Design a protein with these regions (language model features):
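Active-site and NAD+-binding cores of ADP-ribose-processing enzymes
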Residues: 2-22, 27-39, 43, 50, ...
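Extended catalytic/binding region for NAD+/ADP-ribose chemistry, centered on the ART fold
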Residues: 34, 45-87
Length: 146
């Protein structure tokens, strides 16, 4: 049986090659190693501690997935304008991804699917272990006005 697929895009010089997530891992490593509840105002500590414990459990369980991976969008929902945090223009790549893929939301707070509305609008994180679910990769031609 042929798997169901969704068209996706990614803005990156490296295309769909998984990248080490050093910037994003800093937050996880903070929760794993450096978190100190006494750094927060006393009236917020109960809530912050509760959130920290929820994140900590999730981060420990999925830490390997967060090491290497890629960020992508569902085709038709984002364009280069949405990437104004990038310092320079990067190429756009397109591909197809199997719908049964294991994904994470962009904030690394939960596992999700391609139908997650937050992900449809904000993008997804795909761990390197799931890269084999991407097919028909090609660089998208620029549609600059002449």
């Amino acid at each position: 049986m042929t798997p169901q697929i969704t068209k996706i895009i990614r803005y990156s010089v490296q295309g769909f090659k998984p990248q080490y997530q050093s910037k994003h891992l800093k937050n996880i490593n903070y929760h794993l190693n450096d978190f100190n509840i006494n750094d927060f105002p006393e009236h917020l500590r109960y809530t912050i501690q509760k959130q920290h414990e929820e994140h900590l459990s999730f981060y420990k369980e999925h830490y390997q997935d967060f090491q290497y991976g890629i960020w992508f969008f569902i085709d038709g929902h984002k364009n280069n304008q949405s990437l104004n945090h990038l310092k320079y223009k990067v190429p756009c790549w397109e591909a197809e991804i199997e719908n049964d893929v294991l994904l994470y939301d962009v904030n690394w707070e939960y596992q999700t699917t391609l139908s997650d509305q937050f992900g449809v609008n904000s993008g997804f994180y795909l761990p390197a272990s799931q890269i084999h679910k991407i097919h028909n990769i090609k660089k998208r031609k620029s549609n600059k006005a002449s």
